[in-house]
């Protein structure tokens, strides 16, 4: 393998949708709150308000997990961030990659037969683009 420096791949449209939806969700919650007449807002209990904003916060957190997904490739390892879980897999443990027709994203397969989804490489971002990246990863397998 040649020393080319780290390369990071992130989901394209999926990332924009996740963060765009987060902004829209927060904006809608604030707009609805401000648009309610004062007499209605006074009837909302603390528990109801906390439930609403905790739900919005949970959705934003989930969407952030989707948006932060990435695959970083170095000469030593693959770093896979799926949601809030990070996996570092040395190239010596990589057996191969699977990306069949109709698969939403590629899967890294280790010598222990463990499978790690590469969520950052979304097929919806363009199968040909993802196929080029997967082919490059396959060439790096020792």
Positions of the model-derived regions?
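Alpha-helical transmembrane spans of integral membrane proteins, capturing the lipid-embedded, hydrophobic core
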Residues: 22-24, 53, 57
């Amino acid at each position: 393998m040649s020393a080319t420096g780290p390369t990071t791949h992130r989901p394209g449209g999926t990332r924009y949708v996740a963060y765009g939806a987060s902004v829209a969700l927060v904006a809608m919650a604030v707009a609805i709150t401000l648009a309610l007449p004062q007499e209605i807002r006074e009837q909302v209990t603390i528990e109801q308000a906390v439930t609403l904003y905790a739900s919005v916060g949970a959705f934003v957190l989930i969407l952030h997990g989707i948006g932060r997904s990435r695959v970083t490739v170095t000469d030593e390892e693959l770093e896979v961030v799926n949601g809030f879980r990070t996996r570092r897999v040395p190239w010596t443990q990589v057996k191969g990659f699977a990306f069949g027709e109709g698969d939403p994203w590629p899967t890294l397969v280790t010598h222990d037969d463990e499978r790690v989804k590469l969520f950052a490489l979304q097929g919806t971002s363009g199968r040909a683009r993802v196929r080029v990246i997967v082919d490059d990863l396959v060439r790096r397998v020792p």
